[in-house]
């Protein structure tokens, strides 16, 4: 399972821990343009992209879409601010192609944190890595349109070319 492999890059899980995590991952599929998260909604989940591509965005005062990030196959994703601060989301997260996801809800993660004390360290390290990637990406696209920012991203895709072919 790709999600377990990604976790094991930072936190080496034993067999019992692996089974615990697998038991709390919920399979979810999104069709192209489906929303994983809506603006002004409570975010109580963290996802992992087994297959597909997601985008987070919001609208400016003039109604223009502002892309904040792309989430690619093999990565965890969420609205970090909304999840960790228990605030309403300031972004939408939508599928750019059909996606296969695995999702943790907050209750499951609380159980995992209780059973695997090292999980808090994993979250900190992963959150720092994601935040740095997001900051670097945002620096590159701050003055770009949605189309230009997607072009920038598509030039450095690290996942299968099948997903890239599905994006129009």
Task: Locate each region found by the language model.
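Cytosolic regulatory regions built on CNB/CRP/Popeye-like sensor folds
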Residues: 1-158
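Single conserved hydrophobic/aromatic residue that forms the stacking wall/gate
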Residues: 159-168
